[in-house]
Structure formats: structure tokens, C-alpha cells
Amino acid sequence: MARYLGPKCKLSRREGTDLFLKSGVKANDEKCKMNTAPGQHGARRARLSDYGLQLRERQKVRRMYGILEGQFKKYYVEASRRKGNTGATLLELLESRLDNVVYRMGFAATRAEARQLVVHKGIMVNGHTCNVPSAQVKAGDVVAVREKAKKQLRIQNAVELAKHRKELSWIDVNTDSLEGTMKSSPDRSELSADINEQLIIELYSK
């Protein structure tokens, strides 16, 4: 399945919640009609079965992190192999992706922009260039914007936008040097309350 290249607002409207796919320059309700689904009959949302709710939750999280189904399923398999709560581990794996960490540190306005920055070799991990968006960042790793990329206007704008976001306890960022350290594993309590990971686990465990 190809990656979706259409309007970002349409995806958020489909899920009925902000997926943080846009920069946040304007309030989301100014850009998207969040109270209605896309399409001619969007004003009337269909009542979903339990299975339908599970599918929607999977789609929502996949779209939020910009991941295709095959790769998303691999994250579930890996999470189920590890000790502890499978749902929390799944979110930890998603949050530990390099493109997401770059976004969380405020070096990009969206996860899609962060992915592009990584692919174009604008990011270093522990002093070495890494162009793999799905690379797992571990506690103690230092993520930095490469010198040649620091003057990009989009990065400077992203840093300004990030000042209005809630600070996360598991990362430490120096906005002057444009580098940050992942201090610990992502904390589930600081992630979106709109995510119900248990529905995803129920879907895949059938």
C-alpha cells in the first residue's frame, strides 16, 4: 500500500481527532472541520461495532506516526515478545523512532517533516549521520541537527513552535545547539490520552 499524499485535514477529520499532521501555526479547528467526517455524508458518523472501533484505533495511530500496515504489524509482534504491558511497549517503540524523537525534540514541525529531515541526512545520532526514520533511539543517545542543516528556515520555525508544546520528562533539548538527549524510555503518561492502545492489541490478538 502506497503512502497517503492527500489532504492532511481529511485524515484527522476521518478519525475525529487531531493527529498532529499539520504544523500547528493555526488552531486545528480553523483548518479542519473536526466535528464532521470527510465526504458527502460526513455529518452523520456511523455507529461502529467493536471490531470497527479496533480498526479505527489502529488506523488512527498508524496515521499519527505515518506508518504503513506491514511495519505497524511488526511493531506489534515485537511488543508482544517483550515483557510487560504489550500496549505500552507498542507505544514506546513508536515513540522511540528517530523521526518521532526529532519531532518531539522540536527540530521539525510535524512527524512527516522530521522524516524528511532524517532521510535527507540532516540528523546525527551520537555523532554519526543516520538517515533511517525507523531507527530506534535508546536512553542516553544524543540526537542533533547537522551543522549544514541548522540554517534551514523550517527548522528555525519548528523550534519556535516547539516552545509552545508541553515539555517531556524523557528528553532534554538544547535549542541553541539544536541537540537533545533521550534520558529514558518514553513515558506513557505523557503521551496522547486519545490513544486507546488496548483496542489495537485486541485487534491483532484475534
Swiss-Prot record:
Keywords: Ribonucleoprotein, Ribosomal protein, RNA-binding, rRNA-binding. GO terms for molecular function: rRNA binding; structural constituent of ribosome. The keyword DNA damage does not apply. CDD domains: S4. Residues 96-158 form the S4 RNA-binding domain. One of its GO terms (biological process) is ribosomal small subunit biogenesis. It comes from the Bacteria. Coiled coil: none annotated. The keyword DNA damage does not apply. GO terms for cellular component: small ribosomal subunit. Belongs to the universal ribosomal protein uS4 family. One of the primary rRNA binding proteins, it binds directly to 16S rRNA where it nucleates assembly of the body of the 30S subunit. Part of the 30S ribosomal subunit. Contacts protein S5. The interaction surface between S4 and S5 is involved in control of translational fidelity. This is Small ribosomal subunit protein uS4.
